[in-house]
A protein has these predicted regions:
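Post-signal peptide N-terminal segment of secreted/secretory-pathway proteins
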Residues: 46-134
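Boundary at the C-terminal end of the N-terminal hydrophobic targeting segment
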Residues: 22-24
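Short coil/turn segments that connect the beta-strands within blades of beta-propeller domains
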Residues: 28, 140-141, 288-289
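Bacterial N-terminal signal peptides that target proteins for export
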Residues: 1-9
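Acidic, serine/threonine- and glycine-rich low-complexity intrinsically disordered segments
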Residues: 129-278
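Bacterial N-terminal signal peptides
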Residues: 9-17
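Hydrophilic extracytoplasmic domains
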Residues: 249, 253-350
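Residue position within the beta-strands of beta-propeller blades
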Residues: 31-32, 144-145, 293
Length: 350
């Protein structure tokens, strides 16, 4: 299980009352995290690369600031994604059919049961292998998924290995993937073409031949890189029987705020790394007056004044290898709705 956040800061009901009466600007962030959850017993089935005794799991933390007070609210299982005045929830479900294993990503309104896709009978009856999805990015409109599949079916000439990216609508996790141009415009597809060309031009002919040179407009994604959201394209292997012959290509593309949220320019990644050389990621508040550092085994919350990072105010333990997949900021009334929702859900669960 992932380490639990700090629940003892203040009783939730007292905090909620204080927030309702506060006149100071209140701002906070819903932070969605992906980590590897151990499986407590050996797997009784063939799973290829997925046979790691772990699977992707997700948790959401609401962290708020009012005046100089920081609060880490009780965590939510899965990804709690703000969607207008309501919430959606996204997570992962492992399914097993004989020697075939699939980790599905699902999404549904928070007050509804998710529709879980089952394994196709042919795969379960005649194939051995796995298909694994994991979330790289989550927003009110889209999910960015990393998809891996490997296996062998009876009568096939050889095994297969696929590593692809897909950006799908939040309400359609079975979608095969949206074109980068449909989501970000034609200039984004040009950035994909240019990025792939630059990458291939830097390879020797023998290595270059390992890839399909024409980029797939739907094989792209969003992920965290140096404290920001960035776009990347994935080049597919020219031969599907070749293991791991795919390559991720960063794209020279400025994402609009609708995808990234605000990011103050006063705190550069180089400055953050000077302060914390082991920082994995950083999340800077819209007013640049506080930030959260993701370090190898914990989150560290720091005040910021005049561009200078202050001493740590709170820490939250995280599992090794934790990565951020959602960063959603809010202030005042929208944030109070988030606080009320998380507090109400926590009281209903206890």
């Amino acid at each position: 299980m992932a380490p639990r956040p700090l629940r003892w800061i203040l009783p939730a009901l007292l905090l909620l009352a204080g927030w309702s009466e506060s006149r100071a600007q209140e701002h906070g962030v819903l932070l969605g995290l992906r980590y590897e959850e151990p499986i407590p017993k050996p797997l009784p089935y063939y799973a290829g690369d997925a046979d790691s005794l772990s699977r992707a799991a997700y948790r959401t933390l609401l962290i708020t600031k009012s005046d100089e007070t920081f609060v880490v609210w009780p965590e939510e299982n899965d990804l709690l994604i703000p969607h207008g005045n309501t919430f959606w929830r996204a997570g992962s479900k492992r399914s097993i059919y004989n020697n075939w294993v699939e980790d599905f990503v699902w999404a549904a309104p928070d007050d509804a049961s998710p529709s879980l896709v089952g394994i196709q009978p042919y795969n379960g009856e005649f194939c051995e292998g796995h298909r694994k999805q994991s979330v790289l990015y989550a927003s009110p409109q889209f999910l960015s998924l990393d998809q891996q599949s490997a296996g062998y079916c009876e009568g096939a000439a050889h095994p297969w290995f696929f590593n692809t990216l897909a950006v799908v609508p939040l309400d359609s996790t079975t979608h095969t993937g949206l074109s980068i141009a449909d989501v970000l415009g034609e200039a984004a597809y040009e950035a994909l073409e240019n990025g792939v060309k630059s990458f291939l031009d830097g390879l020797e002919n023998e290595r270059r031949a390992a890839y399909i040179e024409e980029p797939d407009a739907a094989n792209w994604g969003l992920a965290r890189r140096e404290g920001r959201w960035s776009t990347l394209g994935r080049l597919e292997a020219a031969e599907t029987a070749t293991r791991s012959a795919s390559a991720d290509v960063p794209l020279a593309l400025d994402l609009p705020p609708a995808f990234t949220g605000p990011h103050p320019s006063s705190l550069l990644w180089t400055h953050i790394q000077t302060f914390a050389p082991d920082a994995v990621d950083a999340f800077v508040a819209p007013e640049a007056d506080w930030l959260i550092l993701l370090r190898p085994d914990h989150l560290a919350i720091h005040p910021v004044a005049d561009g200078a990072i202050g001493q740590v105010a709170l820490t939250v333990p995280v599992a090794p290898g934790t990565r951020a997949v959602m960063v959603q900021w809010a202030v005042d009334a929208p944030l109070r709705r988030w606080v009320e929702h998380v507090d109400r859900h926590n009281r209903q669960s206890n």
